[in-house]
Amino acid sequence: MHIIIAGIDTEVGKTFVSAILATLFQAEYWKPIQSGSLDRSDSTIVRELSGAVCHRETYRLTHPLAAHQAARVDNIPIHAENFSLPVTEAPLIIETSGGFLSPCSQDSLQGDVFSKWPCQWVLVSKAYLGSINHTCLTVEAMRTRNLNILGMVLNQYPKEEEDWLLNMTGIPYLGRLNYENIISKETVKNYANLWKETWEDREAKLCS
């Protein structure tokens, strides 16, 4: 099982979701591109929160910019052919950088590069002004690429807006995130327990 975690934008909760799913499935983790925060990378955070084995990033860029910009500043050209799925028999959680259609290189988008892999996708949407539009546009872009969308995780939406989004997009609900002042290993474990039944039901439907 390979699951790619995509977002409608940057800073929507992808790393938090990755840690939860790594805990839930005892999965390994991989982030193909890390831009900035190399001393406190998303791989480091996921490892601390879940204990997951984390595969080294293909590209480690020093500036917290979009991948193509960070690569330009570092003078490290990104080539799509350099990305390859880590070899593992364990479930694998893959976290993209930024939003679904964020640049991967000077001439490619992450959504196009990573959609070539035989993976399932989870979309993370966080409530902010304009997020409903961004969510609907992202779902449309994912469907245009015929991706296997497992479902959506909703971050800090009011219940009525959750219902509206799920009804309008037709994307299955996989869990919600509340505002957390501090995210700890215990927080992640609690969410994994909360989501367990929803994910088991989703897996059962996929197998039926």
Swiss-Prot record:
This protein's record includes keyword Transport: no
Enzyme Commission numbers on file: 6.3.3.3
CDD domains: DTBS
GO cellular component terms listed in the entry, alphabetical order: cytosol
GO terms of biological process kind: biotin biosynthetic process
Domain of life according to the entry: Bacteria
Keyword Signal: no
Needed cofactors: Mg(2+)
Catalytic site positions: 31
Molecular function terms, GO-annotated: ATP binding; dethiobiotin synthase activity; magnesium ion binding
Residues the entry annotates as binding ATP: 11-16, 42, 95-98, 155-156
Residues where Mg(2+) binds: 15, 42, 95
Reactions performed catalytically: (7R,8S)-7,8-diammoniononanoate + CO2 + ATP = (4R,5S)-dethiobiotin + ADP + phosphate + 3 H(+)
Compartments, record wording: Cytoplasm
Keywords per UniProt: ATP-binding, Biotin biosynthesis, Cytoplasm, Ligase, Magnesium, Metal-binding, Nucleotide-binding
Associated pathway: Cofactor biosynthesis; biotin biosynthesis; biotin from 7,8-diaminononanoate: step 1/2
Positions contributing to substrate binding: 35
Assembly: Homodimer.
Similarity field: Belongs to the dethiobiotin synthetase family.
Chain's role: Catalyzes a mechanistically unusual reaction, the ATP-dependent insertion of CO2 between the N7 and N8 nitrogen atoms of 7,8-diaminopelargonic acid (DAPA, also called 7,8-diammoniononanoate) to form a ureido ring.
Matching PANTHER family: ATP-DEPENDENT DETHIOBIOTIN SYNTHETASE BIOD 2, DETHIOBIOTIN SYNTHETASE
HAMAP family: BioD (MF_00336)
Protein name in UniProt: ATP-dependent dethiobiotin synthetase BioD
Species of provenance: Chlamydia felis (strain Fe/C-56)
Gene: bioD
